[in-house]
Amino acid sequence: MSAYSTNEMMTVAAARRLKNGAVCFVGIGLPSKAANLARLTSSPDVVLIYESGPIGAKPTVLPLSIGDGELAETADTVVPTGEIFRYWLQGGRIDVGFLGAAQVDRFGNINTTVIGDYNKPKVRLPGAGGAPEIAGSAKEVLIILKQSHRTFVDKLAFITSVGHGEGGDHRKQLGLPGKGPVAIITDLCIMEPEAGSNEFIVTSLHPGVTREQVIENTGWAIRFAEQVKETAAPTEVELEALRALEARTAAAHGQQGGEE
């Protein structure tokens, strides 16, 4: 088996979570990479939807933004943005929302707005886009991001997109449909919400990763499932498809290849 990077492991693990035939509302960046890898490997019939209106997008290279022409040119059809949100998302037709994050907390709430005080921020982040609506209305949500003390924090400075709120049935109390976040996939592990509390716990460690590494890179006292699995390493097919996608993207956008 070929050697692989932690970022490749993360992308492959996230792609595997996307079931064949699912209708997936995709975020730009890591979610788009994982979703398109799924389309090219284990889930060829997945329907990828982007905020700008493409339905059934099949890009040959990864889009730079939701307005990338590649999405519209390769889609089955393109509809107005309002229809994406009213008919598809709020109408309960999105099986999976695939989101990234700047920061996430133990209940899968996402911050993509600001680091520090809102009025005097240390960092002003890109903002919400359609993520709050996706997090609120998709039948389930997958979150993908690299893991560190800076990204996995005990308390968010700002909740951009609600996951499980304050835990337990708080999401239901807020009147939000769907399951909310069902998995957080990182470069170290996979986390899933604990039954009852909806606090995210580690259910799978990637090959070679220790519990200590996860603990050191989490801003709260992370807990582990009773039975923690080892994530299956990427296959040659998965790595070949991912690297080819990255190479095509780099060539198309005049970038040097590969990792984000």
UniProtKB/Swiss-Prot annotation:
GO terms for molecular function: 3-oxoadipate CoA-transferase activity. The keyword Transferase applies. It holds the Pfam family CoA_trans. The active site is at E51. Disulfide bonds: none annotated. InterPro entries: CoA_trans_fam_I, NagB/RpiA_transferase-like. It catalyses: 3-oxoadipate + succinyl-CoA = 3-oxoadipyl-CoA + succinate. One of its GO terms (biological process) is beta-ketoadipate pathway. The keyword Transferase applies. Its EC number is 2.8.3.6. Keywords: Aromatic hydrocarbons catabolism, Transferase. Optimum pH is 8.4. Pathway: Aromatic compound metabolism; beta-ketoadipate pathway; acetyl-CoA and succinyl-CoA from 3-oxoadipate: step 1/2. It is an enzyme of class 2 (transferase). Belongs to the 3-oxoacid CoA-transferase subunit B family. Heterotetramer composed of 2 A and 2 B subunits. This is 3-oxoadipate CoA-transferase subunit B. It comes from Pseudomonas knackmussii (strain DSM 6978 / CCUG 54928 / LMG 23759 / B13). The gene is catJ.
